[in-house]
Amino acid sequence: MGAKPEVGFIIPFRNREAHLAQFTKRILEHSRGKYNPWIFVMEQAEGEPFNRGALLNLGVLQVNRILGDNTPIALHDVDMLPAPSVNYHQLEADFVHLATCVSQFKNKMPYQDYFGGVVATTPRSMISVGGFPMDFWGWGGEDDALLLRVKASGLSMRRRYNQYFVSLAHEREIDGDLLWKNRDLLEKMRRDPYTGGRISNEGWTVDQTPSMRDGQISLLRFLCTPT
């Protein structure tokens, strides 16, 4: 039997310790006998609106540095727990949307082009398409923006319609002004998908904080601060 593959989970994060504990426990159970899990927790410092896309980009760069550019990765919200049948480590396309059956949406997609929740890919593919735009602050729009870039790139994309996730309850902070700015940026991206900045660590400092490796799971934490 060959060595188990490495899988990197990239978690955009702030003030969700209880969810992170549940997620880590589930991934440890889910991975047994199938793959070696590496969880990259990209924690945004307090002070600025949350930037999920930028945090995921920063995590991609860390996986690329530590595990290599062809490592399977999951761009993964911390509040989504996978069913045992979810497959993270075998990718039939450059981008595979996994969160198609999520409990909070009654196991349906909330809209036709939904590309949120959990996406499996590799650092190489993310860097090739330019990653998420770096300019989506606050809630909403960055997943749709990534899908625009994937479609424009010519790389392959698939959806798996039998991958189930349980979503954990949480409060979402929505800033109406930022939401409208994000919608305006998304409309500009429909004309030019590369508006809004490509994957980069420019404008951020990223510092590794106390992490954990115990032979079964690797959990690496990084404090990400806008500059």
Say what each PLM segment does.
Residues S103-T121, S128:
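A recurrent flexible, glycine/aromatic-enriched loop bordering the glycosyltransferase active site
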Residues A83-N107:
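Conserved donor-nucleotide/metal-binding helix-loop-beta segment in metal-dependent transferases, i.e.
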Residues D135-G138, D144-T227:
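C-terminal catalytic/acceptor-binding lobe
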Residues G68-A83:
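Short beta-strand-to-loop acidic/aromatic patch adjacent to the donor-nucleotide binding site
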Residues A21-T24, G33-N70, F105-K106:
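Active-site-proximal specificity loops/subdomain of glycosyltransferases
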Residues G2-K4, P12, R16, Q22-N36:
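Short, acidic, metal-binding catalytic loop of nucleotide-sugar glycosyltransferases
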Residues P5-G8, W38, A145:
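Cell-envelope/extracellular polymer assembly enzymes that use nucleotide-activated donors
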Residues Y114-T122, P133-M134, G140-G141:
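A conserved catalytic-core signature of glycosyltransferases
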